Regions:
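Residue-level detector of solvent-exposed, low-hydrophobicity positions
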Residues: 28, 43, 51-54, 151, ...
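C-terminal catalytic subdomain
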Residues: 192-216
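Accessory "access/gating" subregions that flank catalytic or transport cores
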Residues: 71, 75, 79-186, 190-200
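Functionally constrained cores in energy, signaling, and assembly domains
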Residues: 58-60, 138, 216
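Generic alpha-helical propensity signal that fires on short helical segments
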Residues: 36-38, 102, 162-163, 168, ...
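C-terminal regulatory domains involved in ligand/effector binding and gene-expression control
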Residues: 1-117
Length: 216
């Protein structure tokens, strides 16, 4: 895994060192201490518990997220969605080879152009191109939203952006969809894993697909 060593010095004397591992999914492990466990702010770990609470209190998932996270989550998710859209639009404008020795060609722009030319620009093909655009920006070291990880960053943005453009959903509905998606991603992270390093690519992309499905 990606590793960070931090050394402490006083003058020229080394006082100590800590080693940190990035094990994927936003989680870290401290050498000799095991996995760092973040404090859970949500009161329920399983969705069965969450659903029971929602039914007993006649609440929707977005209302529950607002209750736990506070109103500040709305502004934050506006930033998140703006970044998702920016990344898609940026990725669609670029062509050429991605960085690295494999010489992989970008595909998002050519996919969009091909579908426009042959008149078959249906929604699932647009979403296909949007997902490529985000993933290729990630492969180029550009800014993406980890949803839930860099490796799966193309799924949720492409679905939300594609559906909003196609059906003209108001922005408020997209923000609520992000709340739902985030809750489901958090449930997976706390009960299983969203880390490709820990559980393979299916942990990342499978979770992203679940988040997108829940958001819809």
């Amino acid at each position: 895994p990606n590793t960070l060593d931090i050394y402490a010095y006083l003058d020229d004397t080394e006082l100590g060192m800590h080693r940190f591992y990035s094990i994927g999914g936003g989680s870290i492990e401290i050498d000799g201490e095991g996995k760092y466990v973040e404090e859970m702010i949500y009161p329920f770990k399983k969705f069965t518990e969450t659903r029971k609470y929602l039914e007993e209190n006649n609440m929707t998932i977005p209302e529950y997220v607002l209750q736990v996270e506070g109103e500040g989550i709305v502004d934050y998710l506006h930033e998140v969605y703006n970044r998702m859209k920016t990344t898609i639009k940026s990725g669609l404008t670029k062509s050429g080879k991605l960085p690295g020795s494999l010489g992989v060609e970008r595909k998002a722009q050519s996919i969009m152009n091909k579908f426009f030319i042959d008149g078959s620009m249906i929604l699932n093909k647009k979403i296909f191109a949007y997902a490529y655009a985000v993933s290729e920006e990630n492969a180029s070291g550009e800014i993406v939203v980890t949803a839930p990880t860099c490796g799966a960053c193309g799924v949720l943005p492409s679905v939300l952006y594609g559906l909003q453009k196609e059906y003209q959903f108001p922005l408020e509905k997209i923000i609520e969809a992000l709340m739902v998606a985030g809750l489901f991603g958090n449930i997976v992270k706390n009960n299983a894993s969203i880390s490709g390093a820990e559980a393979g690519c299916q942990a990342e992309v499978g979770t992203a697909c679940s988040m997108a499905a829940a958001a819809c």
